[in-house]
Curated annotation (Swiss-Prot):
NCBIfam families linked: PRK00810.1
GO biological process: nitrogen fixation
Pfam family, one: NifW
Disulphide bonds in the chain: none
Name recorded for this polypeptide: Nitrogenase-stabilizing/protective protein NifW
Annotated function: May protect the nitrogenase Fe-Mo protein from oxidative damage.
Lineage: Bacteria, Pseudomonadati, Pseudomonadota, Alphaproteobacteria, Rhodospirillales
Native source organism of the sequence: Rhodospirillum centenum (strain ATCC 51521 / SW)
Length: 105
């Protein structure tokens, strides 16, 4: 089986790290697993991996995974805004203060 086929069958983030022999901290992966895999996919998009030999696929995929993982060791997923729902989210301006004296029974 070709490496690209193996990668296509993986379902857990940990499996990608194991197959590509990339060390990781489980605490980082627990918080940012989907963001890391999404960013890896973005880095590989536009590359026809199926046309490449296994060695090239391994090198490209490993490099993309390492770069994506490194990004999320430095930044929080909410700040990276990888997913559309986070891209369009707005930070709240501040909390409104409602004094207790203004509340009625």
């Amino acid at each position: 089986m070709r490496l690209i086929d193996t990668l296509m069958r993986l379902s857990a983030a940990e499996e990608f790290f194991e197959v590509l022999a990339v060390p990781y901290d489980p605490a980082v992966l627990r918080v940012a697993r989907l963001h890391i895999l999404r960013r890896m996919g973005e880095r590989l998009s536009g590359t026809d991996l199926a046309a490449l030999p296994d060695g090239a696929v391994r090198a490209l995929a490993r490099s993309a995974l390492e770069a994506a993982y490194a990004e999320f060791t430095r930044t929080r997923p909410i700040d990276a805004r990888v997913f559309q729902v986070l891209k369009t989210a707005r930070h709240p301006r501040g909390r409104s203060f409602v004094p207790l004296s203004s509340l009625r029974r």
